[in-house]
């Protein structure tokens, strides 16, 4: 219920991932084909350190950040560990909003908003797109912080006060 939200903080995201309307049939086809493929067997890591090393390599993360993600994201399994997330989350979605639809939803955010984004930007959220989206908010402050998609974990001493100060203003 939007009327119950006093303030909104968006960290490294603002709105949905979008796709051009004219590519809807192609995206739908890809999603159906992916859903029809047999599921791969779970990858078993012999140790947490093996999973941490992979997360560091694939996502360009520091060891402490990768460790946090891995410790939260694996389950013990037979002689090792497996990712606890649903494999279907890695498959393409059949439908995405178009950019105009996403912008309309962003324009509907009525409360004061603080947007905290990483520099450099992620490939799926280029700088021009994210800056344009911020301009669609009714009341927004933008903060760019050196880091990656997990900047809140990489630099909590910077992100924490940015969030706390913004939320405390609502309480006063």
Task: Please give the residue ranges for each predicted region.
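Flexible "cap/lid" loop of the alpha/beta hydrolase fold
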Residues: 6-47
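Core-facing hydrophobic residues within beta-strands of well-ordered domains
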Residues: 4-6, 140
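Conserved loop-alpha-helix segment in the C-terminal half of the alpha/beta-hydrolase fold
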Residues: 108-148
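Nucleotide-sugar-dependent glycosyltransferase donor-binding/catalytic pocket residues
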Residues: 16, 122-123, 152-153
């Amino acid at each position: 219920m939007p009327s119950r939200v006093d303030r909104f903080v968006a960290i490294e995201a603002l709105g949905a991932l979008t796709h051009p309307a004219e590519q809807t049939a192609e995206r739908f086809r890809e999603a159906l084909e992916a859903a029809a493929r047999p599921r791969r067997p779970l990858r078993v890591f012999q140790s947490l350190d093996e999973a941490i090393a992979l997360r560091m390599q694939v996502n360009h993360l520091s060891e402490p950040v990768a460790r946090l993600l891995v410790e939260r994201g694996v389950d013990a399994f037979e002689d090792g560990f497996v990712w606890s997330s649903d494999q279907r989350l890695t498959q393409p979605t059949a439908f995405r909003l178009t950019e105009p639809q996403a912008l309309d939803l962003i324009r509907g955010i009525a409360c004061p908003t603080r947007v905290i984004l990483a520099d450099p930007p992620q490939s799926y959220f280029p700088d021009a797109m994210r800056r344009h989206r911020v301009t669609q908010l009714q009341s927004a402050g933008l903060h760019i912080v050196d880091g990656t998609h997990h900047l809140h974990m990489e630099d909590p001493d910077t992100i924490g006060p940015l969030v706390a100060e913004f939320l405390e203003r609502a309480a006063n």
